[in-house]
Regions:
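Structural recognition of the beta-strand scaffold that forms the well-ordered cores
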Residues: 34-38, 65-68, 82-84, 120, ...
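Sec-dependent signal peptide recognition
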Residues: 2-8
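Active-site nucleophile/metal-coordination loop of metallo-enzymes that catalyze phosphate/sulfate
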Residues: 25-31, 43-123
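Catalytic-site neighborhoods of secreted/periplasmic enzymes
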Residues: 92-96, 102-105, 109-161
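Substrate-binding rim/cap in mid-to-C-terminal beta-strand-loop elements of soluble/periplasmic
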Residues: 84, 246-288, 299
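Metal-dependent active-site segment of extracytoplasmic phospho-/sulfohydrolases and closely related
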Residues: 35-36, 54, 204-248, 281
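Active-site His/acidic residue clusters
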Residues: 138-152, 169-210, 214
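Bacterial Sec-dependent signal peptides at the C-terminal "C-region" and cleavage site
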Residues: 8-30
Length: 302
């Protein structure tokens, strides 16, 4: 009889061990919303003399580096793409500002596009609101618009410099996006027209600083600021009136990140390259990174 009881107990233990346990809850997002603001042509060389009171205040509110490196070549297409697709140009094939890659990318999605952070988010959560508001129309070539619920290019941004603020704030207040990328082109215009270190470039900096401030005010008015992370970044600097080479003035750019769960008044001392931005956004939403990505999460979280 004792042997029978022992055998029954063994069977019960075995059956219980084979039963699936309670599913583990998915970890909560670090923040519910990410707003990326890209300042085209904002080089680190301009920071010391630049009049940017709001940006400097946000550096105290979050984490920052003045030494983020571009991918090469130091042009807009390759670098905005790297921030979204997590890869360098030799992998993505995006070595210029053309709509199509110059050579076949190593990895393509079902959209025949690079796997961007927009794609990762939509794969995991199809209902998540995603959007882009940009002043440079070619920016949309690298975002995978099939993964966007909203995209708007500002027409004649030089003639209507406040339109980027108005459109961005309206979208944020109306839709409260989970992931949004806003592109501001004014500094690049000044760099090309008047050159690195020009009075005209420096005069534009406080105007751009104020546009960033007003967009952030819009995030607050939308009621999502306390559950948001805001990332301020740039694609390249300038050398003279151009870029595309490998001078430090072209390849060093600032990065500022602040908001929910971000370390305050923290200077990032680790190496940061453009494609690390994609990995950091993926970490915020606990998205699985593709094997093709080369970016690593920037250590800015509390």
């Amino acid at each position: 009889m004792k042997r029978i009881l022992i055998a029954l107990v063994a069977v019960l233990v075995s059956v219980c061990a084979c039963q699936p346990g309670p599913e583990k809850a998915a970890p909560a997002d670090i923040a519910g919303h990410v707003i990326v603001i890209g300042l085209d042509g904002w080089g680190t060389w301009s920071f010391e003399k630049g009049d940017t009171p709001f940006i400097r205040e946000m550096m105290k509110e979050g984490s920052y580096t003045l030494y983020k490196r571009t991918v090469l070549p130091s042009i807009s297409g390759a670098n905005w793409a790297a921030m979204m697709n997590g890869t360098p140009a030799e992998s993505s094939g995006i070595i210029g500002n053309n709509a199509a890659p110059y050579f076949k990318p190593l990895v393509l999605t079902e959209h025949n596009a690079q796997p961007t952070f927009f794609h990762l988010l939509k794969q995991a959560r199809p209902e998540a609101e995603t959007g882009v508001v940009c002043e440079w129309g070619d920016f949309l070539n690298y975002a995978d618009t099939l993964c966007l619920d909203y995209f708007q290019r500002i027409q004649d941004p030089e003639g209507h410099p406040d339109a980027i603020v108005e459109e961005s704030v309206k979208y944020i207040k109306d839709k409260k996006p989970v992931l949004c990328f806003i592109h501001i082109d004014a500094l690049d215009h000044m760099g090309h027209a008047y050159g690195q270190g020009s009075a005209e470039y420096y005069a534009e900096l406080p105007l751009v600083d104020d546009r960033v401030r007003r967009i952030v005010e819009g995030v607050k008015e939308a009621g999502i600021y306390d559950d948001s992370i805001i990332i301020l970044t740039s694609d390249h600097g300038h050398e003279g009136t151009g870029h595309g080479g490998h001078a430090l003035n072209e390849i060093e750019t600032p990065l500022v990140i602040w908001g929910k769960g971000i370390r305050k008044n923290h200077e990032i001392t680790e190496t940061v390259i453009q494609y690390d931005l994609a990995a950091t956004v993926a970490e915020i939403f606990h998205l699985d990174k593709p094997q093709s990505w080369r970016g690593v999460c920037i250590p800015v979280f509390e």
